[in-house]
């Protein structure tokens, strides 16, 4: 969500901080700001509502410069998007603070600080943290201790970066439930909410652990655990500038990432399957011991990853015969869950830092589960560190807020898992089809121009309805989510068999209805449902297997290359991604950074 960047350097750091924010734009934000301590130890701040480029323009006007500084992109939680609510927040013109997360007891702390004489100028919970740290600094004149004491009083999940004009040589950071990275450079050191921001600036990084705090100077980074004891944390080399993502020849990151799916699926499968087996070591060292004991499965995730889990339910129950329950993480956290014996708990997350998914995993670790498995795209994430078993997808960095390649690699991972847990020779057919998957993706991507031609038919629509049956119902859900995320068209998805139980009332000549219709055992049932749409004058678009002879009957048929039955949910997802993309482009929306959304949702 919010992006944090901070540095202490022997040079002017303002342009580095700005570039760090540009690399964090993909996370989603509505305002941005920077604060530095200048050569005369004065605290200078610039904040704007809007894009990082607006901040760059404002910085040029004010000629802001300094060797120590913090910067931030804000995604509004407490307080509307505005310059007044943008970070960094100040206290008494001495302390500047950036914050990612939520301080749950901010109202109580606010009232307490008001009694101490503090005045508030914003609606945010962040300003509470700034004043609280100032209060403790007045008592101890030690910035690190002031931050540690303040964090102990604050409830919630957050990460902070703090500077003080009387301590121009240091930057203090703390992590409590929200990710933060420390970076080592030459004559300069950094903090950031994402290692991507530090590429080409830092040579190596430390991923702060839960409860860690750090004091960062030009010469050193000292890390303290939750007990305020100095500790040594593992350092990890950081990839060079050559690996920083760019759009290449594509107009948007989302389109680039859609077209990368064949490659990243190839990477995800590589060295993990052969013609007769899935290498269980792909799921971690413990998998060979755990998998034979699995009798039930619970899958917990959010958003697109939840849809991946829903598809996986069909595969796991059909192939492995394992009862599988799929839960939305934010709901799972707050109910009493019955855990049958020998249940495998699976979490799915692109970032591995999704707050609700992590909280669900922590809850599961206190329950009677056999073990936990994380399917994740980020090897250094909290989810990966906390799970018993891990399958790392190899989707690479995904910049577009609307997930594409991360989703299809999650599906590839789940299909491999179903094959690994399958106890009969159907697993070999699944593996054969998986080996064909990258080529199938390439064929589907050749539909791009045909799908683009549909966009003009959706531009002026207000609503859309997606339909699927069986395992294609979650595919329809994902298609509807993509369309609403980036085109802002209200879209719903239903099992086609539920049409007559309510959704049919919405169907008329102005309602586009999109159906997913592979050649499977439910095809005839689906055709019957679609006749109901046609009879009501609905504007029908059907993605059909190109081996089938369909009678259009007024519907627009979009032929999808034939593929193996187990691959159909993956293959039929791709044209729906393309449809959402081209409709959004035709409408002129911000495809890569849609309004109100964040890439990594690190708060509840």
UniProtKB/Swiss-Prot annotation:
Question: Which EC number applies?
Answer: 2.6.1.16
Name the Pfam families for this protein: GATase_6 (PF13522), SIS (PF01380)
This protein's major location comes to cytoplasm
GO BP annotations, alphabetical order: carbohydrate metabolic process; fructose 6-phosphate metabolic process; protein N-linked glycosylation; UDP-N-acetylglucosamine metabolic process
Record localization: Cytoplasm
Q: Under the cellular component aspect of Gene Ontology, which terms does the record hold? A: cytosol
- Keyword Cytoplasm carried by entry: yes
What HAMAP family does this protein's entry cite?
GlmS (MF_00164)
NCBIfam families referenced in this protein's UniProt entry, alphabetically: glmS, PRK00331.1
The name this protein goes by in its record: Glutamine--fructose-6-phosphate aminotransferase [isomerizing]
Q: What is the source species?
A: Legionella pneumophila (strain Lens)
